[in-house]
């Protein structure tokens, strides 16, 4: 009976640790995304291809659902001339899955320290102007059915102008900025 009690205690501790680390309630607060401070680094700025920058935090469980969607975006749009980049949350450690190995890393993107949450995406048009900044979608999950990104990329690919750099959204996001204590 003592062994059963010890086993139950160990199982409870493991469950409690797992729940605290990996299970989170759905975030129902509104995130306000503003692209005003964002600038591409000089080597990528200016006229050129459509550029999509993926902002991610390896410790954020919200990235898992969106990485499959991002893989599909790369498969669909890289052949159409869209270039894909990633910016990892400063001070974090991790790597994207192998399915996203085609994303080029941007170590420092001016203004990225001011973004509110991740996962997030910024898209620059062929003229080098920021066309979109915000989340991939609203809600708990992200896929091509509820994504904001496919319509933006389609419009830009067709030469249409897009100006959606300020977005309010409710979804699964993790804070980007360092906690101030």
Where are these regions (language model features)?
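Short active-site neighborhood of thiol/selenol oxidoreductases, capturing the structured segment around
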Residues: 43-64, 69-70, 84, 153
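N-terminal targeting signals for export/organelle localization
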Residues: 1-37
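Intrinsically disordered, low-complexity terminal tails/loops enriched in metal-binding residues
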Residues: 27-44, 72-79, 174, 181
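Extracytoplasmic
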Residues: 47-48, 79-82, 116-119
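Short, internal strand/loop/helix patches
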Residues: 97-135
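Structural microenvironment flanking redox-active thiols in thiol-disulfide oxidoreductases
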Residues: 64-112
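Solvent-exposed coil/turn segments that connect beta secondary-structure elements
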Residues: 58, 89-91, 126-128, 135, ...
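Thiol-/selenol-based redox modules, centered on thioredoxin-like
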Residues: 131, 136-181
């Amino acid at each position: 009976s003592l062994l059963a009690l010890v086993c139950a205690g160990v199982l409870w501790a493991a469950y409690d640790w797992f729940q605290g680390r990996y299970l989170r309630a759905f975030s129902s607060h509104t995130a306000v995304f503003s692209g005003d401070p964002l600038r591409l680094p000089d080597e990528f700025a200016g006229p050129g291809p459509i550029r999509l920058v993926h902002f991610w935090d390896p410790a954020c469980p919200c990235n898992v659902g969106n990485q499959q969607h991002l893989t599909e975006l790369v498969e669909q749009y890289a052949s159409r001339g869209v270039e894909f980049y990633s910016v990892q949350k400063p001070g974090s450690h991790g790597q994207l899955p192998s399915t996203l190995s085609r994303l080029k890393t941007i170590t420092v993107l001016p203004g990225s320290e001011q973004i509110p949450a991740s996962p997030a995406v910024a898209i620059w048009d062929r003229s080098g102007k920021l066309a979109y900044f915000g989340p991939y979608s609203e809600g708990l999950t992200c896929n091509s059915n509820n994504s904001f990104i496919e319509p933006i990329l389609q419009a830009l690919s067709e030469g249409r102008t897009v100006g959606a750099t300020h977005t309010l959204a409710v979804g699964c996001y993790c804070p980007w900025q360092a906690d101030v204590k």
